[in-house]
Amino acid sequence: MLDLKFVRTNPEVVKEALKKRNSNVSLDAFLEQEEERRKLLFEVESLKAQRNTVSEEVGRRKKHGEDAEQLILEMREVGQKVKNLEDKLGEIEQSMEAVLYEIPNIPHESVPVGADEEANVEVRTWGTPRSFDFEPLAHYEIGEKLDILDFARAGKVTGARFTFYKGLGAKLERALISFMLDRHSAKGYVEVLPPYMVHRNSMIGTGQLPKFEEDAFKVAGTDYFLIPTAEVPVTNMYREEILEAEQLPIHHCAYSACFRAEAGSAGRDTRGLIRQHQFNKVELVKFAFPENSYEELESLTRDAESILQELELPYRVMALSTGDLGFTSAKTYDLEVWLPSFNTYREISSCSNFEDFQARRANIRFRRAPKAKPEFLHTLNGSGLAIGRTVSAILENYQEADGRVRVPKALQPYMGVEYIG
């Protein structure tokens, strides 16, 4: 979340950011509450000072055997006023906190300004989409023909947007996970295997709650949520901690299953692996010095790109516009892989710098020196990559006319075969 002091002293900056993001949060009402809060706080402090003065006078009179009854009654009245004002102050602060949690991050100055994804800017492309001398199939058609993906039986067992991976399909999924973790670990990322359930405070810390609760799977009768991404548990590993400067930067990579309700996506990508309720992903998470976080974003994006390059999958990098930027992000690059069945690029990774937005929510700080005042660090993360979408891209881009799928060279040591089918 944003710093309350920053919002109070820079209301026009925040209003402009909200406008660029097409946010309907009312900052004027929030600022009116802040003004009332400050007045009440001043009144409470004044009354407490008055109560302390009266209390001292009561003590003095009792010490000298003088009557203090009237002052005692006066002190009780002041105490009741303080309680009433503090109750009102608590209500206002609770209301303000709720609004503060609804205010999105302020876009970095380099983010393209625009209403939606149409304003996203292509930064670079890599590779050339393949020209087929036959009619290419969609990944779900390939998977069903090769009997490595079973959507029908998953639908029978669970419902729509679930999949059984079978045989070499399951092995391909597992190979990709190991390949990605190996490559990222070799670059200095420390591997983490996180819990797949977290409690509400963790979801608040990374920004999924309270705003996006309808997109989350909550475990009935508990305070647990199934994680939508490893970003949530890995970022919250350091929640409520003060790190030392020598610990930074921290780089983690983590494989996890991810669970998303996909509320509001009815009718979109209903077939195949593109938009599932459960999918696997390798996540990259960074904790950085504020002054270095944008360099860290560029390197994080390159690390995600390197996986696509080794797999020889054509892709492009898009800088998201203010209207398409995620709620918690200050700047995001999307990596979009070429999918022949769509005849276009589709998102396979989002790499974001949240600056101190998540760190404030999760209270993750660091000290530059042993006795220095703690500061909020910057958090970043990105998919490195989404496994199901990578499977989709491999099946479609590596399909052969005879129905087989060639295994990318980088994966052959993990798969032990050159072809699927």
UniProtKB/Swiss-Prot annotation:
GO BP terms, alphabetized: selenocysteine biosynthetic process; seryl-tRNA aminoacylation
Keywords tagged on the record: Aminoacyl-tRNA synthetase, ATP-binding, Cytoplasm, Ligase, Nucleotide-binding, Protein biosynthesis
Presence of the UniProt keyword Protein biosynthesis in the record: yes
Mitochondrion is among the record's keywords: no
Membrane spanning residue stretches: none
Pathway the protein takes part in: Aminoacyl-tRNA biosynthesis; selenocysteinyl-tRNA(Sec) biosynthesis; L-seryl-tRNA(Sec) from L-serine and tRNA(Sec): step 1/1
Catalytic reactions of this protein: tRNA(Ser) + L-serine + ATP = L-seryl-tRNA(Ser) + AMP + diphosphate + H(+); tRNA(Sec) + L-serine + ATP = L-seryl-tRNA(Sec) + AMP + diphosphate + H(+)
Main location: cytoplasm
Positions with a binding annotation for L-serine: T229, A230, E231, E283, S383
InterPro entries, alphabetized: aa-tRNA-synt_IIb (IPR002314), aa-tRNA-synth_II (IPR006195), aa-tRNA-synth_II/BPL/LPL (IPR045864), Ser-tRNA-ligase_type_1 (IPR002317), Ser-tRNA-synth_1_N (IPR015866), SerRS_1_N_sf (IPR042103), SerRS_core (IPR033729), tRNA-bd_arm (IPR010978)
Entry's EC annotation: 6.1.1.11
Listed GO MF terms: ATP binding; catalytic activity, acting on a protein; serine-tRNA ligase activity; transferase activity
General function of this protein: Catalyzes the attachment of serine to tRNA(Ser). Is also able to aminoacylate tRNA(Sec) with serine, to form the misacylated tRNA L-seryl-tRNA(Sec), which will be further converted into selenocysteinyl-tRNA(Sec).
Protein family (similarity comment): Belongs to the class-II aminoacyl-tRNA synthetase family. Type-1 seryl-tRNA synthetase subfamily.
PANTHER family recorded: SERINE--TRNA LIGASE (PTHR43697:SF1), SERYL-TRNA SYNTHETASE (PTHR43697)
Subunit structure: Homodimer. The tRNA molecule binds across the dimer.
Protein known as: Serine--tRNA ligase
Species whose genome carries this gene: Desulfitobacterium hafniense (strain DSM 10664 / DCB-2)
